[in-house]
């Protein structure tokens, strides 16, 4: 299931977690965000975005939205200070933020970018899928989302192998398997850093394997409905 979702979102790696709130928290921790850090996000978002930041120990700095109800990139730079460590653009209702400008700011100020993709499965920005542009993308599989499972579920995408390994450890109590000198796995797990217990359960993954076959149809139907209202 992880391979299917990451492939669909045009990302090299994918990690299933308990929910999107955990996905944001784990991603921030993996990216080095600490208690003395500030994270910029939009004020027009659901509580879980902010909860994910606070759970990582960081402070939130809100930026207002543009005419499309997405984070105003022209106001992000004014909010950046010496404590700023990351930006969380929130893609809403299948519409993506101006990611090229956000990535330019991130590069200029050496900031991390965590895409909140809870409402944008399959969305694209200039030919690039949601969750494939920033350092990580965080998704929700809650039943009311564009792509819902049977219950709670979350997902993290990234194109960075080192970051993938760290996220995978953090979501499983900081543990990983060790290899013996022969190169074979010794079957034991070692806790090498602090982590949490936030794995995507098999039921949600199994349900997701079925539902992913329908996501293109759902997105097409929603676009047709949106076009109808636009008229």
Q: Where does each model-flagged region fall?
A:
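Phosphate-binding glycine-rich loop
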Residues: 1-38, 52-55, 62, 128
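Solvent-exposed alpha-helix faces
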Residues: 3, 10, 44, 172, ...
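Active-site phosphate/pyrophosphate- and oxyanion-stabilizing loops and adjacent acidic/basic residues
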Residues: 3, 100-103, 152
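Alpha-helix termination/capping residues and helix-transition junctions
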Residues: 8, 33, 81, 130-131, ...
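PLP-dependent aminotransferase-like
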Residues: 29-117, 124
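Active-site region of PLP-dependent enzymes
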Residues: 120-126, 133-231
């Amino acid at each position: 299931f992880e391979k299917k979702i990451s492939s669909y979102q045009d990302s090299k790696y994918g990690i299933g977690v308990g929910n999107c709130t955990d996905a944001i928290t784990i991603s921030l921790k993996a990216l080095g965000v600490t208690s003395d850090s500030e994270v910029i996000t939009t004020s027009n978002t659901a509580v879980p975005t902010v909860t994910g930041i606070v759970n990582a120990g960081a402070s939130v700095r809100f930026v207002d939205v543009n005419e499309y109800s997405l984070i105003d990139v022209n106001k992000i730079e004014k909010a950046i200070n010496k404590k700023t460590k990351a930006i969380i653009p929130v893609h809403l209702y299948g519409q993506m933020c101006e990611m090229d400008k956000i990535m330019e700011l991130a590069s200029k100020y050496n900031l991390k970018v965590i895409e909140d993709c809870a409402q944008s499965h399959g969305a694209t920005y200039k030919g690039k899928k949601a969750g494939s542009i920033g350092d990580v993308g965080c998704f929700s599989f809650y039943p009311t989302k564009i792509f819902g499972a049977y219950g709670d579920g979350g997902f993290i995408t990234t194109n960075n192998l080192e970051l993938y390994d760290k996220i995978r450890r953090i979501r499983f109590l900081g543990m990983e398997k060790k290899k013996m000198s022969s190169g074979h796995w010794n079957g034991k797990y070692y806790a090498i850093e602090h982590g949490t217990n936030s794995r995507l359960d098999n039921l949600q993954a199994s349900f997701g394997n079925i539902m992913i076959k329908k996501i293109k149809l759902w997105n097409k139907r929603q676009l047709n409905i949106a076009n109808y209202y636009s008229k």
